[in-house]
Amino acid sequence: MQYRRFGRTNLKIPVLSLGGMRFQKSWDQLDFSEISYEEQNNVENILNLASKYGLSHVETAKYYGTSEMQLGMGFKNTKKIPNIIQTKIPPNSDPEVFERDVMTSIEKLKVKRIDLLAIHGINTSEHLFQAIKDGGCIDILRKLQKENLIGSIGFSTHGKSSLIEKAISTNLFDYVNLHWYFINQENTKVINLANK
């Protein structure tokens, strides 16, 4: 497996990661009793294979329905906890709600610490403001870092390049998850800025 440094985290992340967006029975938040044995077993089989082949980074999000819960049960049942766990929490104008969402994700994932915590979907100026304002999401995450509940702080986005540049320029984030691939290289300038 090849590895790369992830943003300014100093974490060596595999070039292939295990994305948790489809590790869910439903986009809705369900009780675990509503997950069938077969549905959960599928998640656990994939975790076992991922571990076998060196996929040491798992990424999920609060908005991915039952994904965090199913991955957490999978980590517990298989004892295959990846080296790097990442989840994403949407920004919120109420810092108490945001903090509660982070704590719920830690609980669902059944871990003591989330290595990479991204503010999910900084897609508008309002989202960025909620993240960076005094007493906002970033301040909550800094507090949780001091408590060793989370590691590095980043953001994900489908926003315009100008907004992404503005977020990177705050120097408050350790990494960014964004779209960039062969047929869509619109964010090349932003990637170059992030590499500085």
Tell where the protein language model's regions lie, with residue ranges.
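N-terminal binding-site loop/beta-alpha segment at the start of enzyme catalytic domains
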Residues: 1-83
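Active-site mouth loops of central-metabolism enzymes
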Residues: 22-41, 87-97, 125-129, 156
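Beta/alpha (TIM)-barrel catalytic core signal, keyed to glycine-rich beta->alpha loops juxtaposed to Asp/Glu
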Residues: 3, 122-196
